[in-house]
Amino acid sequence: MPVTLADIRAASARIAPHVARTPLVADPRLPQVWLKCEHRQPTGAFKLRGATNAVLTLPRRARAVVTASTGNHGRALAHAAQAAGIPATVCLSHLVPDNKVRAIRELGAKVRVTGASQDLSLIHI
């Protein structure tokens, strides 16, 4: 099903109370380029927007969320799940740096570090 402009506007309105409003700044060296400063989100990346929208649109019967990640999406989903009061499990490979693993755990997610690659960590979902 294609995503429409109305879908995008609805998602934007839905997540607005839950994400930071980040600035849009002009790049002085590239006058036709504007930068959206999503690094200012609480989780440090734009992925919080999609994760929050996904959690907010879960069926009411959903009891938990699970994902595989190399870090940023896992952190975003852990943040969104914590805000919604539902448990999150994030499957990571052994390649993910310890600081990212810690950040996800600090948001209350259960972390499963397994697999020599991200593809192999998907097996545990």
Predicted regions, residues:
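PLP-dependent amino-acid enzyme catalytic core
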Residues: 1-123
